[in-house]
From Swiss-Prot:
Superkingdom to which the source organism belongs: Eukaryota
Subunit structure: Homodimer.
Gene Ontology biological-process entries: methylation
Binding site for S-adenosyl-L-homocysteine: Y19, C66, N71, D107, S136, F137
Cofactor binding comment, as recorded: Binds 1 Mg(2+) ion per subunit.
Cofactor(s) recorded in Swiss-Prot or TrEMBL: Mg(2+)
Protein name per UniProt: Probable S-adenosylmethionine-dependent methyltransferase At5g37970
Organism annotation: Arabidopsis thaliana (Mouse-ear cress)
Length: 362
């Protein structure tokens, strides 16, 4: 059986292949829901709960799966600015000390927190107290009833681990033909679906314990349209191409076919109805907002260099862990050439459904 790392961080540092310099696709998506996030806080957040303890007038914000780079700082700054705007708008007198903000940046233990805090904007250090919170968001990372606003964007497709049967040679769910769940093999899809239900359920249960009554959890990310396999999306096509490039490396003796057959990504894109059903089954939250939206870059043809760099920043660590350091450069060099030879037909590819969801703790 293969051994995968317990965490799958984005590529760290600030070099040319780092997530910092290759996360503009995510940034555009986050910016696209910025106004929705502000509206949700202005309309749904009840600041009265902050005044229940006059000795600790603190609003605690957490960005779950923060990674590194400017995206997380932009998100939390928007939340803080909106809360301040709400207080001014309501024009209420709050008892006790002035409101202070604490921001917890959560990601897996081997996330590059050093780079994260080194690149934090200087002005924000006067706006809020920063804390790094290493740990899997599939479980609790904070004390009970300590969180007021939680946020996560484009993270929930990451699983806590690869489904066990997917990498078991004796299992009918062995994902030997692909390196992802592209919904083309029923047994594989079922194994991933079960793992996702468990992990997403764990995420929601953990947030229910951490959030105060009336606290908000803001989610954004991607799902598949019902009835559409991931293999028909451009993202699915690219990952299948990466699998083909790995097989080319096996033919050259750079890696082995057996290693490839025992490698599968710990990611799963649920169908939109499946995702909604998982949320609605949790009785700890009221669903305040549930919208299906499009990604601002859905109708823009992305360059091959952009695609290669984006996927390298996302997958570098896990591929290096499984196949070794010497494989990564050659793999993504071959991906770039394959994309040049077989360009993605964005008009024919199916598009993800992007979601924006606001949950309120009962």
């Amino acid at each position: 059986m293969p051994t995968f790392p317990q965490s799958f961080p984005m590529n760290g540092g600030d070099g040319p292949h780092s997530y910092i310099h290759n996360s503009s696709y995510q940034k555009v998506a986050i910016d696209g829901v910025k106004e929705r996030t502000s509206e949700a806080i202005l309309e749904k957040l009840d600041l009265e709960f902050l005044n229940r303890n006059s000795e600790e007038n603190i609003l605690r914000i957490v960005d779950f799966g923060c990674s590194i780079g400017p995206n997380t700082f932009d998100v939390v700054q928007n939340i803080i600015d909106t809360v301040k705007q709400k207080r001014l708008k309501e024009n209420k007198t709050y008892i006790g000390a002035p409101l202070e903000f604490q921001v917890c940046f959560n990601d897996q233990p081997n996330n590059d927190f050093n780079t994260l805090f080194r690149t934090q904007p200087f002005f924000s250090r006067k706006e809020y107290f920063s804390v790094g919170v290493p740990g899997s968001f599939h479980g609790r990372v904070l004390p009970k009833n300590s969180l007021h606003i939680g946020h996560t964007s484009y993270t929930l497709h990451w699983l806590s681990n690869v489904p066990q049967h997917v990498c078991d040679k004796k299992s009918p769910a062995l994902n030997k033909s692909y390196i992802q769940c592209n919904n083309l093999v029923d047994e594989v899809t079922k194994a991933y679906k079960i793992q996702f239900r468990k992990d997403f359920g764990g995420f929601l249960e953990a947030r229910a314990e951490e959030l105060v009554s009336g606290g908000l959890m803001i989610l954004s990310g991607q799902c598949l349209p019902d009835g559409i396999p991931k293999a028909l999306t451009w993202q699915g096509v690219v990952i299948d191409m990466i699998g083909d490039c790995l097989m080319d490396l096996a033919k050259l003796g750079i890696t082995s076919k057996e290693k490839i057959e025992l490698f599968s990504l710990p990611t799963y894109i649920p169908h939109i109805s499946e995702f909604k059903a998982n949320i609605e089954q949790n009785e700890n939250f009221n669903v305040e907002t549930m919208e299906e939206i499009s990604h601002p870059m859905d109708y823009m043809p992305l360059t091959n260099d952009f695609i290669t760099s984006m996927f390298r920043a996302i997958l570098n660590t896990i591929i290096e862990e499984h196949f070794g350091e010497g494989v990564v450069n050659e793999l993504f060099s071959r991906l770039a050439k394959r994309l040049d030879k077989y360009p993605i037909d964005f008009k024919r590819c199916k598009k993800y459904v992007n979601y924006f969801i606001v949950l309120k703790r009962k």
